[in-house]
Design a protein with these regions (language model features):
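Flexible glycan-contacting loops in extracellular carbohydrate-active proteins
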Residues: 776-807
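Glycine- and acidic/polar-rich repeat regions and solenoidal domains
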Residues: 13, 241-263, 277, 281-287, ...
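Secretory/extracellular carbohydrate-interaction modules
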Residues: 656-729
Length: 819
């Protein structure tokens, strides 16, 4: 089927089934063919605003003006709003819409006042974007109070503050937020308003209609396939998506989100010389039972989420629904995550024998490439995937965290990442890595890659087994050059014949001791800090490091790059790196190939990367009696709950010290760690006096520990302890000294006060009140560590092993700073 030049409308999804096989859809020679899932809108300028009238029933959420995506009206225009805390009750006595920890947030009143003035219908049009470490939830607004309390229409996947003490937010789609060039707003009556960009004449405006462009619908379980179909020379543009009434969240990498083009049971499908652009979700997804797929020389850009998705996140066994043998070659995948920021350039789930070759993937808010989909060591059919000669760059932009240019999960024997150029990666709070072996990554080879200008390590392994990192160049990472997070009882990785050059930050992280368990092989590497400045090796001298068995054949020397200040990492012929067996490679071949015009498209200038923008939580102010938390749920804003059995820490509806609900902890002899069950809060108190209070009741035999920490590492420890008290065998003690009797089966009231920051004296005051008794005061009790300066962590820990229960109620954490 040959298309003449022109624009063709896709008003509804085109479905191709097995009987539609054996067809090529192509543009005529030299013809510009656009297949659009959108509709053009005509309007006019008035008083500096472009306006148009649309059918009020058409509630679109994307707009493209003169070929560029316009920004839906939002606040703030740059950066984020910080959530100020976790309310326990909806505003104005409204009915709950779910767990308070997933439906209520507080913001500064200045941002909430405009929302509180909206009608109920207008409020539900507002999207509240809540950012977590590696994804974002898109909530609809139910209620807003002038004091800053927000209530959402329903709960989504994750509790607020569950991954970090801060909660980045944006408010989107209300008239008062329309205040910057390039923004637009669609009113309930269909009035569309757009503020032109500087110097812009509005001539071409499109909004989306079709939710998907094409679906290839085979049935691999029945051996029925859509096959031998080619799309060549076609431009697919404009795809719709609408936020559900209850909001939307799709997890890490937006894994469950649909694509504009989707395929199940597809064989021998080719997309060549095509454009896939202006989507609200993912571009293309070869999901279940697909193989022998080719995407070649396609321009995939301006995406709501991901570019290419391969395989299925739920099909973890080999069989008819397993996807394999997908080739993505000489393809540009750029500017994604515009609606769902966790979208990835190219995502391989449970798939095998797939190749990404000579691609340019850049300008995403999360990882460029992700391979594997199991957290741990459970075998899956993910194997023998290859990423080679790809340019992976401009990632993160300080929006999300815990990402890499290439991110891997789980066992995947035969997977190789080679010859790639990874650079310009900046995260929101942590984890802007280059090469990232996350949970359970096993059997992966990384070789001949150039990694530079990342916010965190050029290489990071969370935990994994038997990975090989060889013959790579790591240059000028910002915080840590090479990071290892979690030691285990087998060889984690071999790190050899690599060049590591830096000018700032540490050479090795996460904590120094992780490098001295004998479970990493490190040898024949070259290290250099610019200017010959001294540096340590995980807290050790060069001799101490080598005496442990590391780097016995390695060198400290200038590698003699040709011009690293200009981005030229070619080695000079006399480079000492050759003496360690390093094999020079041509990093310049990474990226797309062919004519200069094609390479020029890939070379888009995205501007300087945003680094080091560390979100800082406002000081925590908590008063939680658990009355707003559902029975059986975890405490809101709490971290570190017992993952294997969340019921070990849960809210119950009986026996409370005050009100009807309290928090129950259940200890026992068979828990994984001695400190379980436990939970903690992240207060972010840096100065002044912190006050913590709680009621506690313990069964006989329950051991209970309350501790404050500064999370700044020491040489031999990952944190610094301050106030620490223990309830054990009917007594309250601190620092090994008994302070008072603490009888079981009654509610005890505890208060802890301490100065932190500049005015600290490394002591705390403690008050214990028994039922019907007078408060017992204990003053100037010493901190467990004199090095504690700030309060990052307040924990409730169960170090015992007896089968017993403990209850907590009315937890208060607050801080005052003298003016």
């Amino acid at each position: 089927m040959i298309f003449s030049a022109g624009t063709y409308a896709i008003t509804d999804t085109i479905v191709l089934e097995p009987q539609d096989s054996g067809v090529s859809y192509e543009a005529d020679a030299g013809a510009k063919v656009i297949l659009t899932g959108g509709r053009k809108i005509e309007g006019a300028m008035k008083d500096g605003m472009w306006t148009a009238k649309a059918d009020p029933a058409w509630r679109f959420e994307g707009l493209w003006v003169n070929g560029q995506r316009a920004q839906r009206a939002r606040t703030p225009n740059e950066g984020f709003i910080q959530a100020m805390g976790q309310p326990q009750n909806p505003p104005d006595d409204a009915k709950p819409t779910g767990d308070a920890g997933r439906t209520l947030l507080a913001i500064e009143p200045q941002y909430a006042q405009a929302l509180a003035a909206l009608s109920a219908e207008e409020r539900r049009d507002v999207n509240v974007l809540v950012y977590f470490s590696w994804d974002m939830h898109r909530h609809r607004l139910e209620n807003a109070a002038a004091d800053g309390t927000l209530q959402f229409t329903g709960p989504l996947q994750r509790s607020f503050f569950s991954l970090a003490p801060f909660q980045n937010m944006r408010l989107e789609n209300f008239r008062a937020a329309l205040d910057a060039p390039g923004e637009w707003f669609l009113a309930r009556d269909g009035t569309l308003s757009y503020i032109p960009r500087k110097g812009e004449t509005v001539t071409d405006v499109w909004a989306p209609v079709a939710q998907q462009w094409i679906v290839l619908r085979g049935d691999p379980k029945k051996d029925e396939f859509v096959s031998k179909i080619t799309f060549r020379g076609l431009s697919f543009r404009h795809q719709a998506w609408t936020t559900p009434e209850g909001g939307a969240s799709f997890g890490q990498a937006e894994s469950k989100l649909i694509a504009a083009i989707e395929a199940d049971g597809a064989r021998e499908i080719t997309f060549e010389d095509c454009e896939l652009a202006h989507t609200m979700t993912n571009a293309v997804w070869f999901r279940r039972g697909c193989r022998d797929i080719t995407i070649r020389k396609c321009h995939i850009h301006d995406l709501g989420a991901a570019g290419v998705k391969i395989g299925d996140p739920t099909i973890s066994k080999d069989g008819p629904e397993h996807t394999s043998h997908v080739l993505v070659e000489n393809t540009i995948i750029q500017s994604g995550g515009r609606v769902f920021p966790a979208g990835i350039g190219a995502l391989i789930f449970h798939a095998s024998d797939c190749t990404l070759r000579h691609c340019d993937i850049g300008d995403f808010f999360y990882s460029a490439v992700s391979i594997g989909w199991t957290w741990g060591y459970k075998p899956t059919p993910c194997a023998r995937n290859t990423v080679e000669a790809c340019n992976l760059h401009h990632l993160g932009w300080a929006e999300l965290s815990d990402m890499g240019a290439v991110y891997t999960l789980g066992p995947q024997p035969g997977t190789v990442i080679r010859g790639c150029h990874m650079h310009d990666i900046g995260c929101a709070s942590y984890g802007g890595w280059g090469m990232y072996n996350d949970e359970g990554s096993t059997g992966i080879v990384w070789e001949n890659n150039l990694v530079h200008d990342t916010q965190d390590g050029g290489y990071h392994q969370h935990y994994g087994r038997g990975n090989i990192i060889r013959n790579n160049i790591f240059a000028f990472q910002k915080e840590v050059q090479i990071r290892r997070s979690k030691p285990e009882e087998f060889l984690a990785f071999a790190f050899e014949q690599n060049i590591v050059v830096f000018s700032e930050g540490k050479l090795f992280g996460h904590v120094d001791k992780n490098w001295f368990d004998g479970r990493v092989f490190v040898n024949r590497n070259l290290y250099w800090k610019t200017g010959g400045a001294p540096f340590d090796f995980a807290g050790k001298t060069w001799d101490e490091w080598r005496n442990f068995g590391h780097d016995v054949e390695s060198v400290i020397a200038d590698p003699l790059f040709v011009a690293p200040e200009n981005g030229n990492y070619t080695l000079r012929p006399e480079s000492p790196a050759l003496k360690i067996g390093f094999t020079p490679f041509d990093w310049r071949i990474a990226g797309v190939t062919g004519e200069d015009a094609w390479k020029k498209i890939a070379a888009t200038d995205f501007g300087p990367m945003k680094y080091g923008i560390k979100p800082k939580a406002p000081p925590m102010k908590l008063a939680d009696g658990f009355e707003g938390t559902p029975i059986g749920a975890k405490p809101s804003q709490a971290q570190g709950l017992y993952k294997k059995d969340p019921a070990m820490v849960r809210v119950v509806g009986e026996g409370a010290a005050h009100g009807e609900r309290c928090l129950q902890l259940t200890d026992g002899p068979d828990l994984t760690s001695a400190y379980e069950p436990h939970f903690y809060y992240l207060p972010n108190h840096e100065q002044g006096t912190t006050h913590v209070a709680f009621d506690v009741k313990l069964e006989p035999g329950y051991e209970f520990l309350h501790e404050w920490r500064d999370n700044t590492p020491l040489a031999d420890k990952a944190y610094r302890s301050g106030p620490m008290i223990e309830f054990k065998k009917g007594a309250l003690s601190s620092g090994g000294r008994k302070l008072a009797d603490a009888p079981p089966d009654v509610w005890l009231h505890v208060e802890v006060n301490a100065k932190i920051g500049d005015g600290r004296d490394n002591t705390f005051d403690l008050t214990l009140t028994l039922p019907g008794g007078q408060p017992q005061h204990f003053e100037k009790l010493p901190f467990a560590s004199t090095h504690m300066e700030k309060l990052d962590w307040v924990g409730f820990i169960s170090p015992g092993k007896e089968s017993a229960k403990c209850w907590l109620d009315e937890i208060v954490i607050e801080n005052t700073v003298a003016k």
